Amino acid sequence: MFSKLTPLAETGIPTLSCANAAGRLLHSDSRQIKQGDIFVACPGEYADGRSYIPAAVANGAAFVFWDDDGKFAWNPEWKVPNQGIKDLKHRAGILAAQVYGNVSDGLKVWGVAGTNGKTSITQWLAQAADLLGEKTAIVGTVGNGFWGALEETTHTTPAPVDVQTLLYRFRQQGATVAAMEVSSHGLDQSRVNGVSFRSAIFTNLTRDHLDYHGTMEAYGAIKSRLFYWHGLKHAVINVDDEYGAELVGRLKKDCPDLAVYSYGFSEHADIRITDFTASSDGIAAVFQTPWGEGKCRTRLLGRFNAQNLAACIALLCANGYPLDKVLDVLAKIRPASGRMDCIMNSGKPLVVVDYAHTPDALEKALATLQEIKPQGAALWCVFGCGGNRDRGKRPLMGAAAVQGADKVVVTSDNPRLENPHDIINDILPAVPAPECVEADRAAAVRYAVEQAAANDIILIAGKGHENYQDVQGVKHRFSDLEIVGQALLTRK
């Protein structure tokens, strides 16, 4: 695997025969091709891009790079210049980077990896960097683009050619920084090959995606690849996480030229969180760092968000921004959409919409809300589990809900191609006395809002910012935030 842009001879990619590429866009989806664009055709996760060469040519492709596996042959009827490259599936990002002129070399690219927290941290880094004088682009789950103007996306980390095209466009639009969520799928499928990462954050490693990775060991090994990236200058690691603490030790041994910064509540952390306080108004903490000590108070909720703030402080200070200014701008940041998103109406329950879809994330979200729950009030949890994903996670989610909430409503998430009732039945053994079982998620949300007391807190977990529900392969319009708003309006 080639993680970082290297000379052509070292990557094994031959000298590119694509002339006059400057200004052209590359795409691996033939439907995006416009007159003069370049098509990159290689086998993908679900389809073989080489099957779509005729469509790309019909749409105006001026050049085609294609995966030369020794079996596929170029059809002379496709009368456009072309070049076959071996193992293009894993080299597409490097190829695109070279065609675009290595644009990520001219950006401060910050990567964020880990099971939970990637979206919040990338969006906070973008907001903070903008306030510090940068122009920061975002690549991640909620969308790609600039803060306040994100375009929806289907993948946390896009396809390799799309990643490079995004970076090229961002640079054209004046970006100086790119904050990127780096998923385990993205690392495993070579989607970020060719990206010059300057700094990287590791948030945590908890159970997720085992339907894909198989074991936690394999999952962790893939996550750690980002921190061995050629040219990486700073690694920022959560040492409150067991895997993170181990990773710090390995990196200090294996990468003597890498600046490694640990963060967390641990007394051994380089960026240590102390004097933490939490209320319904937000959190505050003192951060002891190699650059000095300071306090930050924000409207964010949760102990885990203090850890996320520490990660941001470490990365920003490592990149040369003064600690006092970093703390000042972080106090002004807004939560990412669907991440501990509070909907408050006077005389009605506080409803919090969060993307928590792993046992660890659900446990932490509920613990946060228990801390701020009024005396005598109840904490509700409305959640489900995604279909066609790790079945072993379902009872663990149920157990986390029972442990952390006073009242549990079990419902659907994105059932995908599974029967919603089958998914619920996998959850229920861990939820012996649910308040309600309702497969219709909208009805489940309305039930909780209608039945909760005025001083109760309701966590709607799992979908966060998503504006759809995937049922039998069809994405129907659905938003937890919208359903909650409507339910609060009609509550008597």
Curated annotation (Swiss-Prot):
<feature type="binding site">
    <location>
        <position position="189"/>
    </location>
    <ligand>
        <name>UDP-N-acetyl-alpha-D-muramoyl-L-alanyl-D-glutamate</name>
    </ligand>
</feature>
<dbReference type="GO" id="GO:0000287">
    <property type="term" value="F:magnesium ion binding"/>
</dbReference>
<comment type="similarity">
    <text>Belongs to the MurCDEF family. MurE subfamily.</text>
</comment>
<keyword id="KW-0436">Ligase</keyword>
<dbReference type="GO" id="GO:0071555">
    <property type="term" value="P:cell wall organization"/>
</dbReference>
<dbReference type="InterPro" id="IPR005761">
    <property type="entry name" value="UDP-N-AcMur-Glu-dNH2Pim_ligase"/>
</dbReference>
<feature type="modified residue" description="N6-carboxylysine">
    <location>
        <position position="223"/>
    </location>
</feature>
<dbReference type="GO" id="GO:0051301">
    <property type="term" value="P:cell division"/>
</dbReference>
<dbReference type="Pfam" id="PF02875">
    <property type="entry name" value="Mur_ligase_C"/>
</dbReference>
<keyword id="KW-0460">Magnesium</keyword>
<keyword id="KW-0573">Peptidoglycan synthesis</keyword>
<dbReference type="GO" id="GO:0009252">
    <property type="term" value="P:peptidoglycan biosynthetic process"/>
</dbReference>
<comment type="function">
    <text>Catalyzes the addition of meso-diaminopimelic acid to the nucleotide precursor UDP-N-acetylmuramoyl-L-alanyl-D-glutamate (UMAG) in the biosynthesis of bacterial cell-wall peptidoglycan.</text>
</comment>
<feature type="binding site">
    <location>
        <position position="389"/>
    </location>
    <ligand>
        <name>meso-2,6-diaminopimelate</name>
    </ligand>
</feature>
<feature type="binding site">
    <location>
        <position position="462"/>
    </location>
    <ligand>
        <name>meso-2,6-diaminopimelate</name>
    </ligand>
</feature>
<feature type="binding site">
    <location>
        <position position="30"/>
    </location>
    <ligand>
        <name>UDP-N-acetyl-alpha-D-muramoyl-L-alanyl-D-glutamate</name>
    </ligand>
</feature>
<dbReference type="GO" id="GO:0005737">
    <property type="term" value="C:cytoplasm"/>
</dbReference>
<keyword id="KW-0963">Cytoplasm</keyword>
<keyword id="KW-0961">Cell wall biogenesis/degradation</keyword>
<dbReference type="Pfam" id="PF01225">
    <property type="entry name" value="Mur_ligase"/>
</dbReference>
<keyword id="KW-0131">Cell cycle</keyword>
<feature type="binding site">
    <location>
        <begin position="413"/>
        <end position="416"/>
    </location>
    <ligand>
        <name>meso-2,6-diaminopimelate</name>
    </ligand>
</feature>
<dbReference type="GO" id="GO:0008765">
    <property type="term" value="F:UDP-N-acetylmuramoylalanyl-D-glutamate-2,6-diaminopimelate ligase activity"/>
</dbReference>
<dbReference type="Pfam" id="PF08245">
    <property type="entry name" value="Mur_ligase_M"/>
</dbReference>
<dbReference type="GO" id="GO:0005524">
    <property type="term" value="F:ATP binding"/>
</dbReference>
<keyword id="KW-0132">Cell division</keyword>
<feature type="binding site">
    <location>
        <position position="183"/>
    </location>
    <ligand>
        <name>UDP-N-acetyl-alpha-D-muramoyl-L-alanyl-D-glutamate</name>
    </ligand>
</feature>
<dbReference type="InterPro" id="IPR036565">
    <property type="entry name" value="Mur-like_cat_sf"/>
</dbReference>
<keyword id="KW-0133">Cell shape</keyword>
<dbReference type="GO" id="GO:0008360">
    <property type="term" value="P:regulation of cell shape"/>
</dbReference>
<protein>
    <recommendedName>
        <fullName>UDP-N-acetylmuramoyl-L-alanyl-D-glutamate--2,6-diaminopimelate ligase</fullName>
        <ecNumber>6.3.2.13</ecNumber>
    </recommendedName>
</protein>
<dbReference type="InterPro" id="IPR036615">
    <property type="entry name" value="Mur_ligase_C_dom_sf"/>
</dbReference>
<dbReference type="InterPro" id="IPR035911">
    <property type="entry name" value="MurE/MurF_N"/>
</dbReference>
<feature type="binding site">
    <location>
        <position position="466"/>
    </location>
    <ligand>
        <name>meso-2,6-diaminopimelate</name>
    </ligand>
</feature>
<dbReference type="InterPro" id="IPR000713">
    <property type="entry name" value="Mur_ligase_N"/>
</dbReference>
<keyword id="KW-0547">Nucleotide-binding</keyword>
<feature type="binding site">
    <location>
        <begin position="114"/>
        <end position="120"/>
    </location>
    <ligand>
        <name>ATP</name>
    </ligand>
</feature>
<comment type="pathway">
    <text>Cell wall biogenesis; peptidoglycan biosynthesis.</text>
</comment>
<dbReference type="InterPro" id="IPR013221">
    <property type="entry name" value="Mur_ligase_cen"/>
</dbReference>
<dbReference type="InterPro" id="IPR004101">
    <property type="entry name" value="Mur_ligase_C"/>
</dbReference>
<feature type="binding site">
    <location>
        <position position="191"/>
    </location>
    <ligand>
        <name>UDP-N-acetyl-alpha-D-muramoyl-L-alanyl-D-glutamate</name>
    </ligand>
</feature>
<feature type="binding site">
    <location>
        <begin position="156"/>
        <end position="157"/>
    </location>
    <ligand>
        <name>UDP-N-acetyl-alpha-D-muramoyl-L-alanyl-D-glutamate</name>
    </ligand>
</feature>
